[in-house]
């Protein structure tokens, strides 16, 4: 299931961050889940669509697309 959220924060040096989803817990996002060519990064406040999977430490984003 694809959901839409907004990037809460993303650390380019560490390569991860979190996405806010209304009515849900924040979702962890790793740079490897971002669907783009070149440098994979997200900006705070940016809208994204993605799928949620169960990661080792809770919900994790996959197939992240910048909107």
From Swiss-Prot:
Can bind to ATTGG and CCAAT motifs (Y-box motifs) of single-stranded oligonucleotides. Keywords: Activator, Cytoplasm, DNA-binding, Stress response, Transcription, Transcription regulation. Disulfide bonds: none annotated. It holds the Pfam family CSD. This is Major cold shock protein CspA. InterPro entries: Cold_shock_CspA (IPR012156), Cold_shock_domain (IPR050181), CSD (IPR011129), CSD_CS (IPR019844), CSP_DNA-bd (IPR002059), NA-bd_OB-fold (IPR012340). It comes from Bacillus cereus. Homodimer. Residues 5-64 form the CSD domain. Induction: In response to low temperature. Transmembrane segments: none annotated.
């Amino acid at each position: 299931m694809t959901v839409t959220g907004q990037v809460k924060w993303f650390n380019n040096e560490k390569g991860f961050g979190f996405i806010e989803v209304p009515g849900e817990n924040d979702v962890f996002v790793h740079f490897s889940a971002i669907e783009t060519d070149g440098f994979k990064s997200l900006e705070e406040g940016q809208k994204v669509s993605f799928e949620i999977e169960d990661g080792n430490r809770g919900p994790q984003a996959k197939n992240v697309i910048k909107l």
